[in-house]
Amino acid sequence: MLRRFHLFALALMLFGAAGLSRHTFAQTTQPAQTAQPAVPTPTPELKVDKKVQPVTGKDAKTPTAEQVVETVIIVYGGGGGRDTLKQIRRNGVERGKVTRTANDGRVEELSYEQRFVRGETAGKDKIRVDQKMPTMEYALVFNEGRIWGIINGTAFTPKQDVTAEFLSQSQHGIDALLRYKENGSTVAFVGKEKLKGLDLWVIDLTDKDKSRTRYYISANPDIRKTARVLWLEYEETPPEASAPSKYRRTFHDYRYSQNTLVPFRSVLYRDDKQVQEARVQTVTYGIKMDESFFQNPEAAAN
């Protein structure tokens, strides 16, 4: 009930009373929720950055970049915005399956378990992704800027392409937009477009390494659909290539997990060819995390 009230209040700020008159905010059937072992955290009162107001009815056509992004942050925080995301998503565990298509057309499926602890910035995060394939199991660990792999309890240096893919997921992801201020990134409003019948805000994010990601965000006046990242695009030169490739990641099956918005399915395209599909099965935030998960076995032994 609290979340519905907060989102209704947000709708008033987003599009004004006139915009709401065209929509009926009746109770809607939500997608079936994946069973969550943790008790959902209550959504705090709606808080808005006083320096940057979210998009309102009067400026919905020509908002600033910060207005759009701050609106996205409010929506993904279930109405509580940045404070809710920091409180609930400070750590967690995500489990799911990934289907990959190799350059030679081979398709492989793996299951994964990702544990994370958020730092003040993305560079200070701790992330561990355990991956299980039919023929092997291994983990990749990011700990405050350092990356290594673990297989059978022994540390190893991942291949360059594996490291690049691992880093790209956080550098060019939704979290990079939600944490743009903490990471010292800049955002620019490209424009409002209509693509594939969708009203979109287009935002460019440039991080401190000058890497750019373009986000296509729903500008639908319906509060149940607005301010969601529908897809993003970026260019990157793979380690084995001499020219950059164009990547596009699309996001689907949005659900609320502990009062924060999560896409449970994403698809990655490289030069318009699908190379990866990820499906989240469960995600739980606010779990006490053992530091040993993020330690290098060799360093721990010494």
What annotation goes with each model-predicted range?
Residues Q27-V48:
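N-terminal propeptides/low-complexity segments immediately following signal peptides
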Residues V48-A155, G184-K194:
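N-terminal mature ectodomain segment of secretory-pathway/periplasmic proteins
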Residues F15-F25:
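C-terminal segment of classical bacterial N-terminal signal peptides
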Residues K196-E298:
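Gly/Pro-enriched, hydrophobic low-complexity segments
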Residues M1-L10, S21:
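Bacterial N-terminal signal peptides that target proteins for export
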Residues A102-E108, T135-L140, A155-P158, K210-R214, ...:
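Short, surface-exposed beta-strand/loop "edge" segments at domain boundaries and coil↔beta transitions
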Residues E109-E113, L140-E144, F156-A164, Y216-I217, ...:
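Short amphipathic beta-strand/extended segments with alternating polar/hydrophobic composition
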Residues T41-T43, P54-T56, A60-V68, I73-G77, ...:
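Flexible, processing/modification-adjacent segments and terminal tails
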